[in-house]
């Protein structure tokens, strides 16, 4: 720029020839580097044409001979990639993105992984590394799941997967005890469901498969063939495949019959025990009745013996006949004066003078029957029974010389050793 300014100053001079020479020389200097730029463009264009042609010698520079496989320059592993044209790359704002399929130790394993992913994306008509007939079994399995689930299963089989994670789906090594644990995600709104720990990866993978079929149906992604779990699922009451209504009803009837038979087999011994238990009570009741009858007979015999003993005592020693005394000072019923309540009446000054006192005057000239009823009014309602028997009265005729119809018996006890109570009974003879 400084040179151009100097040239402009020089052009102001009256000589016009000098200015014309400077203007003609500047474009010549600026056009000198242009051929170099053209050479760079020519070098880049043929290299781009060669990259599109797989048969060109430039293709020999690729890290792998298989389609979709490249070798990592640092790790040395072979990585499988897939270009998904149908997806939209939001980062670069363009259509299509690269899908990572995992890193493998062998080049052939990475090539097989690419073929499986290509079959899932574009079908059997796409270009593969190996013939499509080698993937007949995998074609059936991949049709049950989505693209994302199948790609995740392919990545798990790669050797470059995170350490501690098994090659089987839903299986990982426990960080404490080193055993293999199984988990399944997105069950009942939870992040994952813990299925337990196992000694081998295969056992944990089978546990995951069972849970996946139970919660996600027959179309769930499993580590092994679903036919290996049909018997186990039936025992749990899980039927992964659709069943006809007729066959389903027959199966229900068969299961119901089996349940009834098992219940009957369990209830038969119980019924026998119940019958034995029911047969035993009548024998016990008969024995109890016999014992009661024997007790009653023994009580009756005891009562009869007690009555005989009482009668013998009364007839022999306990009967005391109260005869009338010739003394006018005593009455025939003076046994009543034995009570302490009548002791004041027995002490009289006339007794010292030997003057007889007529005691009936003390009772206001009342008859004997009225007085005796008044005295024994409280005890007249008590009945004598065999249990409370203290005294038994034996009536006998009064002697002809006595004018009073009363005969009284008194005893202190039914036996000389058992009781000490006093009881009185009177018998009127008309």
UniProtKB/Swiss-Prot annotation:
Q: Where is the composition biased (Low complexity)?
A: 1-26
Subunit: Interacts with KIN10 and KIN11.
Q: Which Gene3D superfamilies match?
A: AP2/ERF domain (3.30.730.10)
Induction pattern: Transiantly in leaves by sucrose, but not by abscisic acid (ABA).
Q: Which residue stretches does the UniProt record annotate as biased composition, category Basic and acidic residues?
A: 260-274
Task: Report disulfide bridges, numbered on this chain.
Answer: none
Which GO BP annotation is one of this protein's? Answer: lipid metabolic process
* CDD domains xref list: AP2 (cd00018)
What parts of the sequence cross the membrane? none
State the function annotated in the UniProt record.
Answer: May be involved in the regulation of gene expression by stress factors and by components of stress signal transduction pathways. Transcriptional activator involved in the activation of a subset of sugar-responsive genes and the control of carbon flow from sucrose import to oil accumulation in developing seeds. Binds to the GCC-box pathogenesis-related promoter element. Promotes sugar uptake and seed oil accumulation by glycolysis. Required for embryo development, seed germination and, indirectly, for seedling establishment. Negative regulator of the ABA-mediated germination inhibition.
Where does the protein end up?
Nucleus
Pfam family example for this protein? Answer: AP2
Annotated PANTHER family: AP2-LIKE ETHYLENE-RESPONSIVE TRANSCRIPTION FACTOR, ETHYLENE-RESPONSIVE TRANSCRIPTION FACTOR WRI1
Name of the featured protein? Ethylene-responsive transcription factor WRI1
The UniProt PTM text for this protein says:
Ubiquitinated.
Q: Where is this region: Disordered?
A: 1-66, 260-297, 398-422
Q: Which GO terms describe its cellular component?
A: nucleus
What organism is the protein native to?
Arabidopsis thaliana (Mouse-ear cress)
């Amino acid at each position: 720029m400084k040179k151009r300014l100097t040239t402009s100053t020089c052009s102001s001079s009256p000589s016009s020839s000098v200015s014309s020479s400077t203007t003609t020389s500047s474009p010549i200097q600026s056009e000198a580097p242009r051929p170099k730029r053209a050479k760079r463009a020519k070098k880049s264009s043929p290299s781009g044409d060669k990259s599109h042609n797989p048969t060109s010698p430039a293709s020999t520079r690729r890290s792998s001979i298989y389609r979709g496989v490249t070798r990592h320059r640092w790790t040395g592993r072979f990585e499988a990639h897939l270009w998904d044209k149908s997806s939209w790359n939001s980062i670069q704002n363009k259509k299509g993105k690269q899908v990572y399929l995992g890193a493998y130790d062998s080049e052939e394993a990475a090539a097989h992984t690419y073929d499986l992913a290509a079959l899932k994306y574009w079908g059997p008509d796409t270009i593969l590394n190996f013939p499509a007939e080698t993937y007949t079994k995998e074609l059936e399995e991949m049709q049950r799941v989505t693209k994302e689930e199948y790609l995740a299963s392919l990545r798990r089989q790669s050797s470059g997967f995170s350490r501690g994670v098994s090659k089987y789906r839903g299986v990982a090594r426990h960080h404490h005890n080193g055993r293999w644990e199984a988990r399944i995600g997105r069950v009942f709104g939870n992040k994952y469901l813990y299925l337990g720990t196992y000694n081998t990866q295969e056992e944990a993978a089978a546990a995951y498969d069972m849970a996946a079929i139970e919660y996600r149906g027959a179309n769930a992604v499993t580590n092994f063939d679903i036919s290996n779990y049909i018997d186990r699922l039936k025992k749990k009451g899980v039927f992964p495949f659709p069943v006809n209504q007729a066959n389903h009803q027959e199966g229900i009837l068969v299961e119901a019959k089996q349940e009834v038979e098992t219940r009957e087999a369990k209830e038969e011994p119980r019924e026998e025990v119940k019958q034995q238990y029911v047969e035993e009570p009548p024998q016990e009741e008969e024995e109890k009745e016999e014992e009661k009858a024997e007790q009653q007979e023994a009580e009756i015999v005891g009562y009869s013996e007690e009555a005989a003993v009482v009668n013998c005592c009364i007839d022999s020693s306990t009967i005391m006949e109260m005869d009338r005394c010739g003394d006018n000072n005593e009455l025939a019923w003076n046994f009543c004066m034995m009570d302490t309540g009548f002791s004041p009446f027995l002490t009289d000054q006339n007794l010292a003078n030997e003057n007889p006192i007529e005691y009936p005057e003390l009772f206001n000239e009342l008859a004997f029957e009225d007085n005796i009823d008044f005295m024994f009014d409280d005890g007249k309602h008590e009945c004598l029974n065999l249990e409370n028997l203290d005294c038994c009265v034996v009536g006998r005729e009064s002697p002809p010389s006595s004018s009073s119809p009363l005969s009284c018996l008194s005893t202190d006890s039914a036996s000389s050793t058992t009781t000490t109570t006093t009881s009185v009974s009177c018998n009127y003879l008309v």
